[in-house]
Amino acid sequence: MSDRQQVTNARGERIAIVSGLRTPFAKQATAFHGVSALDMGKMVVNELLSRSELDPKLVEQLVYGQVVQMPAAPNIAREIVLGTGMNVATDAYSVTRACATSFQSTVNIAESIMTGNIEIGIAGGADSSSVLPIGVSKKLAHALVDLTKARTFGQKLAIFRRLGIKDLLPVPPAVAEYSTGLSMGQTAEQMAKTHGISRADQDAMAHRSHTLAAQTWASGVMKNEVMVAHVPPYNQFIEKDNNIRESSDLASYAKLRPVFDRKHGSVTAANSTPLTDGASALLLMSEGRAKALGYTPIGYIKSYAFAAIDVWEDMLMGPSYATPMALKRAGMQLEDLTLIEMHEAFAAQALANMKMFASKKFAEEKLGQNRAIGEIDMSKFNVLGGSLAYGHPFAATGARLITQMCNELKRRGGGVGLTTACAAGGLGAAMILEVE
């Protein structure tokens, strides 16, 4: 049995990425304050369809993701279909794979095309850190259910008397892993300590990311993949990511105090991604259908892989496990790649993964391979800047990486690129893209 992955349909046609688009990414409680993930999702899918000049009725399936879900609209994908002029019979369902969510939605659409179930589909993801499902305490939730069963005033009063003042306080969404109680930042701090990632190296990576992202925006190339978002009540708009430090100064990074280990830590707000609002979407088709409709795809999916590892240590090392799987399925080595895009959740996490890529010991002990994945050539790595600068709306980041990679390879005359991300729960994703 071959290790190669056949990312084609029964006719041998490749899975074409026709176009990709995203909203600007905005820091929490700024430009998209009060705008839900659903509204941003509808916004970007509408604009994607408009720019593609595709009849919405031709879309056969939409798979969309959201990490911080709103109880009022648990199936964000179906709501997007109903809010964007697509046929009401269009199949739609929602997925979540933490920070790799839009990798998952993309793969789901690709696999639907591979099996012949559809020819045209849309994938993507959206998240809002500004519109959050604020909950109630367990005791209050229990009491509210009991109140629905109480028949007399006395019974209701007895239920209220069980509650204290603190039981009435709102409960924000958890920022820690359910299974471990550890936050992503605490895991990044652990990885920095375990793998000897210095504060100086983390700050240097953040500075590099912001500098390259600022240069990329200044060059004008991002305008083709980032829409202008008009924010309700439509008296203002946002046209650019607002987390990027336009004049990043490396010396200024050293002034910030560590966040997750204030005494001995190295992970700061500046070398971590901020809480971010945003949405992204991809239009995918079978190669034959894309050409029949007159489209020139921006890229094709060559291979993909997902990995799952232990959550107690090095939980954000997913790229180091998923990447060798995707490379093997593509029949490639790391040095064969033209470009590499790795999600920078934290500088510490990205640097730790890069270190493991180059480690023969890691390959032997963790991957069962006799050679390292490979040392990353920094001239190929996150050449337009990364998540540290652009921000990270959890479910939207994967599609950003895919779109950005395809467009940059196209500008360079084609090639093959790796996109990869870590994710909460010890998950990892990798996708190899080819561009002509």
Swiss-Prot record:
Top-level taxon: Bacteria
Enzyme class: transferase
Pfam families the UniProt entry points to: Thiolase_C, Thiolase_N
Cellular component aspect of the GO annotation: cytosol
GO molecular function: acetyl-CoA C-acyltransferase activity
TM stretches of this protein: none
E.C. numbers: 2.3.1.16
PROSITE patterns referenced in this protein's UniProt entry, alphabetically: THIOLASE_2, THIOLASE_3
Lipid metabolism as UniProt keyword: yes
Protein's GO biological process: fatty acid beta-oxidation
Key words of the record: Acyltransferase, Cytoplasm, Fatty acid metabolism, Lipid degradation, Lipid metabolism, Transferase
UniProt-annotated catalytic positions: 99, 392, 422
Broad class of the protein's primary localization: cytoplasm
UniProt-listed CDD domains: thiolase
InterPro entries: Ac-CoA_C-AcTrfase_FadI, Thiolase, Thiolase-like, Thiolase_AS, Thiolase_C, Thiolase_CS, Thiolase_N
Pathway linked to the protein: Lipid metabolism; fatty acid beta-oxidation
Localization per Swiss-Prot or TrEMBL: Cytoplasm
Catalytic activity: an acyl-CoA + acetyl-CoA = a 3-oxoacyl-CoA + CoA
Role description: Catalyzes the final step of fatty acid oxidation in which acetyl-CoA is released and the CoA ester of a fatty acid two carbons shorter is formed.
Stated family: Belongs to the thiolase-like superfamily. Thiolase family.
Complex and partners: Heterotetramer of two alpha chains (FadJ) and two beta chains (FadI).
Protein's name in the database: 3-ketoacyl-CoA thiolase
